[in-house]
């Protein structure tokens, strides 16, 4: 087979570089269309790639080999300046090994076992790129909201070129700047959680000051901040001014729809974990145990004045801490199929955080890292999932069974299967969800906004006459009442918050969750650092109350009385208008705002209806009809008894 080497050499004051991914994808697309792709290998020599995701996309769109000469030259320069204490061969090998490890990790998340199978697989979804660019250069890759076109890409390349070759021949600043992609830097990459918003949220909840909270949400929802898809949407407020606040559903009723995210005991401290549970139990909401189990000492407090028992008990692939008592203490049992911030990966608790008391709760060994496998090894089909749902329902008849999915293209079809399998709740988790132990490439490049997955799920369930059978929940960095109202209008009935409650308890976004060095005692097991925890349940309660109150203000302006009335009302949302030619003006939210049926179609059920819930027929199980009646007297007297029964394959659980 022949080889074609694409080089970025020759770039100078008068010659602009073509983005390497665009060039590779264009060449590969041409070769596929002319049926020559199997006769030639594409080798790219480029200065652009330096991170795992860069190489993963180049390989995924057709490159056979990549020579990242600038990254390797930079290593050589760093060694010469004494910044790296290795010789060049060691340093370059370590760098390449890290890249290979990252690419293998990405391939494994997609269920691909060889790099040859990964090459040219195009297993990506684009966010913010126009269909014209995708159809021409990245065919078969999904891009649902449109975005920048070829002219915009050219302008960006020109801007980067001019930063290296000054068109006015003036002196250039050759220093390298930190763009603040992962950590906040002044006047660089924008972050929703920044020093200002963190300070305002903490002060508002600590002082119980709603006016300060409104200042916080004003910063989050600022018109000039276009960080999320929902920031491009606006409301169609009622022309008559709406309804009086007194006619809107109460704060207390709305708060019962709120949940805290699945953060395990181990990933966060005992104090932080219990603080959230106490807060949510007081307001009638639900806290989530995460996948790390829960101590019996907390479970027995259920129903008491200081109730530390998490209402939601999570079952993940590792089954850490899952016992009969754990399951029977739940009001909701959640099966974690994936995690919003790192879909395709399992949970990971670093070894340094597995203290003896954590190992005890998780039934594991201290000092040994705990990794949940990416898949559940007993779930390879919807039928397998249906069996696990049925088993868990038999373990706790009173608990709702929830299934956690992530926002991705096609999640609607999966959600339809989950609804048919008997789940009571479907959670759509967005990519903004935080996680302390995820690789950087996953945090920044895996998952999708919850707006996409939520809208698709709601629309698909309606079209398949399944919407009334399940509750839809959404989470992923919901920071204001506006965010929650939009989530409701796109189809969600319940709402999860994780980062915000942590911030109210003192989190200052040091981003060292995985290192066990959290300076405020939130995400550490170190006994000395835990003493610095000063969070209170009241702070979390204040946040939830403020969110519900702000929701009520929007609902009043919309003329909506209850959250149930609000669910699915995407017809009350409209895309904002931006000046022609701007990046924002090229975003197309029509697919998200599509309503499968008009509001006037009264026969269509747009939200959960309790009467339509899945019937497991638990009263007809072999347990209820044979085993329990036979054992009733022995159980009452706490005696042993042997019985003989016929078990058939129709008896799914016993």
Can you say where each PLM-predicted feature lies in the sequence?
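Conserved, mostly hydrophobic/aromatic
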Residues: 8, 58, 114, 280, ...
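Gly-rich Lys/Arg/Thr-decorated short loops/hinges at beta-loop-alpha junctions or inter-strand turns
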Residues: 7-15, 37, 254-260, 343, ...
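Flexible glycine/proline-rich, aromatic-decorated loop/lid segments
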Residues: 24-30, 37, 52-86, 93, ...
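Glycine-rich beta-to-alpha transition loops that act as phosphate-gripper elements at the mouths
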Residues: 40-52, 291, 404-410, 468-482
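Short, small-residue-biased leader/transition segments that mark boundaries at the very start
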Residues: 2-6
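Catalytic cores of alpha/beta
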Residues: 49-61, 410-421, 479-492
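Conserved, well-structured core domains of diverse proteins
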Residues: 90, 94-97, 101, 105-108, ...
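Glycine/Thr-rich beta-alpha phosphate-binding loop at enzyme active sites
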Residues: 12-24, 28, 366-380, 414-463, ...
């Amino acid at each position: 087979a022949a080889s074609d080497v694409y080089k970025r050499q020759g770039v100078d004051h008068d010659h602009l570089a073509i983005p390497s991914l665009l060039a590779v994808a264009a060449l590969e697309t041409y070769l596929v269309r002319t049926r020559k792709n199997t006769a030639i290998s594409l080798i790219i020599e480029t200065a652009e790639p330096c991170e795992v995701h860069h190489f993963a996309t180049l390989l995924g769109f057709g490159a056979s080999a990549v020579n990242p000469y600038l990254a390797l030259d930079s290593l050589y320069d760093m060694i010469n300046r004494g910044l790296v204490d290795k010789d060049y061969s060691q340093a370059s090998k370590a760098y390449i090994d890290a890249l290979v490890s990252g690419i293998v990790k990405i391939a494994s998340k997609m269920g691909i076992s060889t790099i040859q199978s990964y090459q040219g697989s195009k297993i990506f979804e684009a966010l913010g790129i126009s269909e014209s660019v995708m159809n021409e250069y990245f065919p078969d890759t999904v891009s649902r909201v449109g975005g920048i076109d070829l002219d915009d890409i050219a302008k960006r390349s020109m801007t980067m070129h001019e930063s290296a070759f000054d068109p006015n021949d003036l002196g250039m600043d050759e220093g390298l700047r930190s763009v603040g992609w992962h950590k906040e830097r002044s006047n660089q990459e924008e972050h929703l959680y920044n020093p200002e918003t963190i300070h305002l949220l903490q002060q508002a909840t600590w002082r119980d000051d709603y006016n300060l909270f409104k200042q916080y949400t004003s910063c989050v929802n600022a018109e000039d901040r276009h960080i999320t898809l929902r920031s491009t949407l606006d409301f169609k407020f009622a022309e008559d001014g709406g309804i009086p606040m007194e006619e809107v559903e109460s704060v207390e009723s709305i708060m019962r729809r709120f949940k805290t995210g699945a953060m395990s005991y181990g990933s966060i401290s005992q104090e932080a974990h219990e603080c959230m549970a106490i807060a949510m139990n007081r307001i009638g909401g639900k806290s989530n145990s995460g996948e790390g189990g829960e101590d019996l000492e907390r479970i027995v407090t259920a129903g008491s004045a200081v109730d530390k028992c998490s209402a939601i008990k999570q079952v993940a692939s590792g089954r850490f801490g899952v016992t009969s008592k754990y399951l029977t203490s739940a009001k909701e049992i959640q099966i974690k199929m994936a995690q919003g911030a790192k879909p395709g990966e399992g949970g990971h608790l670093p070894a340094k955080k597995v203290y003896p008391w954590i190992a005890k709760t998780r039934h594991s060994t201290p000092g040994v890292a705990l990794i949940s496998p990416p898949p559940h090894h007993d779930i390879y089909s919807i039928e397998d999932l249906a069996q696990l749902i049925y088993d868990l329902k038999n373990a706790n008849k009173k608990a709702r069974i929830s299934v956690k999915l992530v926002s991705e293209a096609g999640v609607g079809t999966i959600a339809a299967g989950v609804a048919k399998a008997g789940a009571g709740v479907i959670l759509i988790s967005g990519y903004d969800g935080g996680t302390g132990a995820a690789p950087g490439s996953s945090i920044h490049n895996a998952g999708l906004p919850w707006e996409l997955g939520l809208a698709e799920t709601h629309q698909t369930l309606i079209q398949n006459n399944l919407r009334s059978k399940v509750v839809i929940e959404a989470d992923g960095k919901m920071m204001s009442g506006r965010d929650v109202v939009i989530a409701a209008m796109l189809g969600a009935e319940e709402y999860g918050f994780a980062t915000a409650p942590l911030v109210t308890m003192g989190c200052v976004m040091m981003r060292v969750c995985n290192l066990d060095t959290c300076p405020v005692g939130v995400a550490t097991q170190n006994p000395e650092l835990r003493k610095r925890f000063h969070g209170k349940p009241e702070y979390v309660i204040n946040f939830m109350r403020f969110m519900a109150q702000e929701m009520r203000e929007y609902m009043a302006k919309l003329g909506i009385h209850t959250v149930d009335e609000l669910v699915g009302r995407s017809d009350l949302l409209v895309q904002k208008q931006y000046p022609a030619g701007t990046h924002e003006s090229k975003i197309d939210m029509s697919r998200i705002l599509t309503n499968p049926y008009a509001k006037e179609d009264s026969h269509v059920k747009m939200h959960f209806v309790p009467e339509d819930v899945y019937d497991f027929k638990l009263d007809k199980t072999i347990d209820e009809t044979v085993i329990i009646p036979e054992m009733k007297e022995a159980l009452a007297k706490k005696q042993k008894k042997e019985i003989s029964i016929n078990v058939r394959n129709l008896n799914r659980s016993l």
